[in-house]
Amino acid sequence: GDVRHADKAMEILRGYASTLQKIYGPDDPLCAGLQGFMLINAAEIMRYTYQDNQYVKGWSEADTKSIEGMFRNVFLPVLTTFVQAKPYANGNWGGSVNKMVMAIGIFCNDEPLYNQAVDFFYNSRDNGSLPNYIAETGQLQESGRDQAHCMLGVGVLAELAECAWKQGDNLYAALDNRIMKGYEYLSKVNLGYTDVPFEVWKDATGKYCNWQNMGEAELGKFRAVFEIAYNHYVERRGIAMPYTEKVLKR
């Protein structure tokens, strides 16, 4: 590969770690979750593949201290405020936030923080927990809203499950493969099938209970979130996902 890309990645990470002091705004938890996850993935890659030596100014112990500090001291407080608050958002927020909490736990080798994210996934009152975002039928908390947010919501749950899988925990299997059911439901809806069950959702906040029908906005506009679940359930585990497969082969 071209070492200049690695150098640029390190420049970006060091730049943020040395200057970022606060994340603020009305969507700050979502920003911290989504944008932070991209940063922490890059940091994880560089930390273990581009070490400092006599030839390149790669990852050093100083980088570990400063970049871990950024995630703990700038990102985590925003995420923690959301986690501890009374539920107030659609589930894609909670899923995005919790995914980043887990990622920080992994990156910083903080097992209690990682376990906190696992507990949120199973047990939180927030719309972003697994049982509150995906019903047994596969319907998603935001199915009555639009399809773009559904793809985001189920996608972040799959990414979280993949992070946990790398740590030896199988969250993909939780609640009888609930994530898989969500993907199959989402795929079937967006492929144009009409024989899909839909119920008015009673969400955790009480604010999003007025969607009477399937959300048609962004219908059939597929985002790149289907591959990760298909790879796990079909390629790793040998479980059929016929509608998700149709999405990927369309």
Predicted regions and their residues:
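CBM-like carbohydrate-recognition segments
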Residues: 171-250
